[in-house]
C-alpha cells in the first residue's frame, strides 16, 4: 500500500425506503428532506468531502429523479481538479435486472472502479445522520493490514436484529472475529452485556480484495448479494476484516454532547426522533458546527419573517428551527422544524412537528406530533395529530408512537 493511496468513494443510494413511506412514495430515501434545508444524501457526501475525498460515485436506483437533480445542482466540482460527485443509475450491465443487493450494486458498476484504478474503496450508506472523518478510518485500515474494515458503533442489545453485529477478536482488538447480519439473538459486549458493537454500514476495502470477494459472491448460490450479510462475513471468516470504533473519530468543532452522534433514520420514528435531536437547547446533533459543515443548496430565498405582535395574535416560534423563506404570520410554532417557504397563518398552532417545503397552515389550524410532506395545505380550523382515529380515516399514516404523516400535496379539509 502506498503512503498516499488513491481513494474512490461509493455511496449506496439505491434503497427503496419502504419503512419511510409515505415520505418515499415519490422519491428515493436519500432524497428525503431533513433538518429544514438538507436532504439525507447531503450528510454522507459532506463527510466524504470534508475528509478530503472528492472522487465520489453515487449508486442510485428507485425513484431517483429528485436525487439525481439534487446531486447535479448542489454537488458540482471542477473536473479540472479531478473532483466529482457522479450519480450512476442501475445500468443492467450484467443482466436484465435491478441491483440484487448492495454488493451486487457495486459489482455491476465495477467498470467504473476499474477506470479509476483506486488503491482503496470507501463505501458508505446514504440514509444516516452523522459526522465522520473517513480519513481516520482509512489510516487505521492501512495500519492494521486488514483487507476490509467495518465502522462500528455501540447500540442497545435489543436492537441487534436491526444491525450487523460485530464480535471483536479479544487478542487483536482492531480485527473482527465474527460478523452476523441482523441476528435474532446475540450476546452483549464483555464490558457491557446490554450493548452490541453494530455495523454502521460504512466500509473501507482494498480494491483487489474487494473485486475477488464480489466476484465470488456473484457466483454463489446462497447469497443475498449484500455488503453486510455476505461480504463482511466473508472477510471475517478469512481473518481479514478489521473494525473501526466510531467513538474514536474526532471531528473539529464537536462537543461532548454531539461527539460520535449517529442515527439510522430508516423508519418514521427514527426520522422524527432525529429531528427532535436538532432542536434542543444543547442539541444532540449540532447543525451549526462550521468547522465540519453539512453542505446543501443555499438557494435565493429571503430570510424568515415573523409578523403580528398583538396580545392574542403573536407570530412566534420557540425551541424550533425555522428555514429561509418561512413566514409565521400571527401563528404559534413550538419545538418544531420548518422547511423553506412554509406559511403559518394567524392563530394556527404547530407543536412537536416537522413541516417540509411549501406547507401552508391556515388560520386556527392545529398540528401536533406530525410530519407534513411538501406542499401540504391545512384549511382553516383543520387538524392533524389531534385525533388518531380521524387521521387514520383520512388515510394518513399513524405510527404506534403516535406520529402522524401526511403525504405530499395533500389538502387537509375538516
From Swiss-Prot:
GO terms for molecular function: ATP binding; glucose-1-phosphate adenylyltransferase activity. Pathway: Glycan biosynthesis; glycogen biosynthesis. It is an enzyme of class 2 (transferase). Keywords: ATP-binding, Carbohydrate metabolism, Glycogen biosynthesis, Glycogen metabolism, Nucleotide-binding, Nucleotidyltransferase, Transferase. Alpha-D-glucose 1-phosphate binds at residues 99, 164, 181-182, 199. HAMAP family: GlgC. Belongs to the bacterial/plant glucose-1-phosphate adenylyltransferase family. This is Glucose-1-phosphate adenylyltransferase. It comes from Bifidobacterium longum (strain NCC 2705). The gene is glgC.
Amino acid at each position: 500500500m502506498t503512503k498516499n493511496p488513491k481513494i474512490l468513494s461509493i455511496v449506496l443510494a439505491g434503497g427503496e425506503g419502504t419503512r419511510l413511506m409515505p415520505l418515499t412514495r415519490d422519491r428515493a430515501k436519500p432524497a428525503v428532506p431533513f433538518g429544514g434545508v438538507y436532504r439525507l444524501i447531503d450528510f454522507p457526501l459532506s463527510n466524504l468531502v470534508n475528509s478530503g475525498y472528492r472522487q465520489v460515485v453515487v449508486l442510485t436506483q428507485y425513484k431517483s429523479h429528485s436525487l439525481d437533480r439534487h446531486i447535479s445542482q448542489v454537488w458540482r466540482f471542477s473536473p479540472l481538479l479531478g473532483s466529482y460527485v457522479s450519480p450512476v443509475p442501475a445500468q443492467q450491465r450484467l443482466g436484465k435486472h435491478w441491483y440484487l443487493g448492495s454488493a451486487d450494486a457495486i459489482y455491476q458498476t465495477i467498470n467504473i472502479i476499474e477506470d479509476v484504478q483506486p488503491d482503496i474503496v470507501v463505501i458508505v450508506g446514504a440514509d444516516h445522520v452523522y459526522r465522520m472523518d473517513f480519513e481516520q478510518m482509512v489510516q487505521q485500515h492501512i495500519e492494521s493490514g486488514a483487507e476490509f474494515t467495518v465502522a462500528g458503533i455501540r447500540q442497545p442489545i435489543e436492537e441487534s436484529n436491526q444491525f450487523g453485529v460485530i464480535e471483536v477478536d479479544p487478542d487483536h482488538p482492531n480485527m473482527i472475529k465474527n460478523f452476523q447480519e441482523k441476528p435474532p439473538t446475540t450476546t452483549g459486549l464483555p464490558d457491557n452485556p446490554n450493548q452490541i458493537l453494530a455495523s454502521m454500514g460504512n466500509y473501507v476495502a482494498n480494491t483487489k480484495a474487494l473485486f475477488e470477494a464480489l466476484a465470488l459472491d456473484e457466483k454463489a448460490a446462497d447469497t443475498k448479494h449484500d455488503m453486510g450479510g455476505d461480504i463482511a462475513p466473508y472477510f471475517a471468516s478469512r481473518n481479514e476484516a478489521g473494525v473501526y470504533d466510531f467513538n474514536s473519530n474526532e471531528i473539529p468543532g464537536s462537543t461532548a454532547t454531539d461527539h460520535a452522534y449517529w442515527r439510522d433514520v430508516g423508519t418514521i420514528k427514527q426520522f422524527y426522533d432525529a429531528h427532535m435531536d436538532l432542536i434542543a437547547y444543547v442539541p444532540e446533533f449540532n447543525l451549526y458546527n462550521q468547522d465540519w459543515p453539512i453542505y446543501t443548496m443555499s438557494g435565493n430565498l429571503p430570510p424568515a419573517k415573523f409578523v403580528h405582535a398583538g396580545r392574542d395574535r403573536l407570530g412566534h416560534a420557540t425551541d424550533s428551527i425555522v428555514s429561509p423563506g418561512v413566514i409565521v404570520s400571527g401563528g404559534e410554532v413550538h419545538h418544531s422544524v420548518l422547511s423553506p417557504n412554509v406559511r403559518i397563518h394567524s392563530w394556527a398552532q404547530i407543536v412537536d412537528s416537522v413541516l417540509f417545503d411549501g406547507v401552508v397552515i391556515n388560520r386556527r389550524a392545529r398540528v401536533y406530533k406530525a410530519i407534513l410532506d411538501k406542499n401540504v395545505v391545512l384549511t382553516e380550523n383543520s387538524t392533524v395529530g389531534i385525533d388518531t382515529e380521524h387521521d387514520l380515516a383520512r388515510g394518513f399514516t399513524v405510527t404506534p408512537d403516535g406520529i402522524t404523516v401526511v403525504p405530499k400535496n395533500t389538502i387537509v379539509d375538516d
